């Protein structure tokens, strides 16, 4: 992961949003020294901005820094991209608190996905060229203006897809697809519980459920988001703040559900398991219950660990149920597997069956606000970061 290390190590530590020093005297012939200084400044390379995680803790641990731009020099099998949009994921929030095990050593540029334009192609790359619009799935390092990545981790963006939609697609939709279809074996007539149904993965999962006939979707979210959930395809929105989702589901479906998508962990995994019908599956793909505030909460860690679900093979056999675990970060070497899923997702997009729902778009300068938007669960859909100017949300 040399790209991330180079970005972090070369960062100047200066906020790129600060105005440059004024040089009014540079045009004054009576001040030759000032003129020479201005000329030297003009000849210096431009700066590229990046976000750097400098330590574990609150929102202030992610700093906007800059590094001198250099001519792109991708190695064999690599591409250099100019990024236009980057995805923010729950794993990035956990990484900031030191809770994500796939993060390279600090300081590091976070970010697992983005979309942009190819500006240079390395030796041996024949299926990409300068000017191509691509989206990228990477272990980290995507929150910067330019990045060099392996070509096999990039995917061509469909003509009708925007950069923002492309930056919102990969992590959320790959996760939702593989949980529902590869693990869950979603079939017509099935019922699915989608936790955090207004989040990026949740919205993606609900759209994918709509591609299968007669699927009933139970979706948990705060009451203010229920209208958006219904518009996206949730059959039965449930306000987890005021009701017990287990009781609500049992009222409608006494036998339970076929698939539980569990990003929560802790005691909620056990609840999901007990909601399963015979031949049902709970697929756990996150530990959102660990995050209770901007900084790491040791009590939440202890509580979630203590309540971690455990089941024996004999119990699974007797119940005719399955428990599965999914972690996209550990599939970074499974190029063919992931590429096949992306191909199916792009086909669904081109057919009009799925479309990433963008909650908000934030400039790099407001990364703290973007993280807060997601961590406080105010978002409906995907939260994005962009190197360019702020957009109205």
From Swiss-Prot:
Compartments it resides in: Cytoplasm; Mitochondrion outer membrane
Record-stated family: Belongs to the zinc-containing alcohol dehydrogenase family. Quinone oxidoreductase subfamily.
One of the GO biological process terms: negative regulation of mitochondrial fusion
Top-level lineage group: Eukaryota
An MF annotation (GO) of this entry: zinc ion binding
Acetylation as UniProt keyword: yes
Protein name in the entry: Synaptic vesicle membrane protein VAT-1 homolog
Kinase among keywords: no
PROSITE patterns: QOR_ZETA_CRYSTAL
């Amino acid at each position: 992961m040399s790209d991330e290390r180079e970005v972090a190590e070369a960062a100047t530590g200066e906020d790129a949003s600060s105005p440059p020093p004024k040089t009014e005297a540079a045009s004054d012939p009576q001040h030759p020294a000032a003129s020479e200084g201005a000329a030297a400044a003009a000849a210096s390379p431009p700066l590229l901005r990046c976000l750097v995680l400098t330590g574990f803790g609150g929102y202030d641990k992610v700093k906007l820094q800059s590094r001198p731009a250099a001519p792109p020099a991708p190695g064999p099998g690599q591409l250099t991209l100019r990024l236009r949009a980057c995805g923010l994921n729950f794993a990035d929030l956990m990484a900031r608190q030191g809770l994500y095990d796939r993060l390279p050593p600090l300081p590091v540029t976070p970010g697992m996905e983005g979309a942009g334009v190819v500006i240079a192609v390395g030796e041996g790359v024949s299926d990409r060229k300068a000017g191509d619009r691509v989206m990228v799935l990477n272990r980290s390092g995507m929150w910067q203006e330019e990045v060099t990545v392996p070509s096999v981790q990039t995917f061509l963006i469909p003509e009708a897809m925007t950069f923002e939609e492309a930056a919102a697609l990969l992590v959320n939709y790959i996760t939702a697809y593989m949980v529902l279809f590869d693990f869950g074996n979603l079939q017509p007539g099935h019922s699915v519980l989608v936790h955090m149904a207004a989040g990026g993965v949740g919205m993606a999962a609900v759209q994918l459920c709509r591609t299968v006939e007669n699927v009933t979707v139970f979706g948990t979210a705060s009451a203010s988001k229920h209208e958006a959930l219904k518009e996206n395809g949730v059959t039965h929105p449930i306000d987890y703040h005021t009701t017990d989702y287990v009781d609500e589901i049992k009222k409608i479906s006494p036998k339970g559900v076929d698939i539980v998508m569990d990003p929560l962990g802790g005691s909620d995994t056990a609840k999901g398991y007990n909601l399963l019908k015979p031949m049902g599956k709970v697929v756990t793909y996150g530990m959102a219950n660990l995050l209770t505030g901007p900084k790491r909460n040791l009590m939440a860690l202890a509580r979630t660990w203590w309540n971690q679900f455990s089941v024996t093979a004999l119990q699974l056999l007797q119940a005719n149920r399955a428990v599965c675990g999914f972690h996209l970060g550990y599939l970074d070497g499974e190029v063919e597997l992931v590429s096949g899923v992306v191909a199916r997702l792009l086909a669904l997009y081109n057919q009009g069956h799925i479309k990433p729902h963008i909650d908000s778009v934030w400039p790099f300068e407001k990364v703290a606000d973007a993280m807060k938007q997601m961590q406080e669960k105010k978002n409906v859909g995907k939260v994005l970061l962009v190197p360019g100017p702020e957009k109205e949300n």
